[in-house]
Amino acid sequence: MSSLVIVASTDTDFGFLPESLNVVRETSRSAAVECSQSDWEELKPLLEAHACDAALFDVRPKLADFKLVAMDMDATTICNETLDEMADMAGVGQEVKAVTERAMLGELDYEASLRARVATMKGVAATLYEDVIVERLQVQPALQTWLSALDENNTHRILISGGFQPVVDHFVEAFDFDAGFANRMTIEDGRFTGELEGELVDSSYKARRLEATALALGIERSQTIAIGDGANDIPMLKTAGIAVGYHPKPAVEPYADIVLRHTGYESLSLFFK
């Protein structure tokens, strides 16, 4: 038998679950059930109907056992897609947003689509970085709840983003991440050239960076957690000990041990012991 952890989006007594199950209510919104894979498959429609997220573990993990968390930034740590917001402020929003959505769904080559979107920034003042941070970008609700749980366990945390380094640096400092890694747009005379410089932070880079950081810290891959939402996060999710899909695109869900559809960071630590 495996351990099924159920987290509801609102307070509940879990009375909607079959009486045949031995349900152990842990908090006002979470419960644990010992069940088989087939039981879990049968429960999925019921849990979806009651706006519950759930994860099945052979052995339920302890949060204290994890020493490194790698998080995507756009639509994972923050609510927005940074380049979409920058493009909107620069007057090319609709064009760029459509390409971003297809790239995150895995329908387009990531590098080609990113370079095409970055090209639309040519000639735009680089002060747009500061403007988008102040005027547009919003942190995901209850992010600090999750980060505080990590702090209690002295867990290292890093941001790995296909976004841009100055924006990542802002959130690294604001939320006390250990480090942040992202792409860089070339700037000349205070304006974007429409090109990228340095190593591309794509899907394979994200996985390599997680693995390299763990190695440098003497942490086993089994002691890592990765959190992401888009197709470019899949290799990173596959590398980690526990993969979390944060309101993920459909292509991401099969690779996630925990999928947050109905809940968010206020609930993530409830899946662990």
Regions found by a protein language model. Name each.
Residues 61-108:
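Active-site neighborhood of HAD-like aspartate-dependent phosphohydrolases
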Residues 109, 119, 126-128:
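Cytosolic catalytic headpiece of P-type ATPases
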Residues 116-121, 138:
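Long, charge-rich alpha-helical interaction segments
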Residues 128-273:
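C-terminal cap/substrate-recognition subdomain and adjoining C-terminal extension
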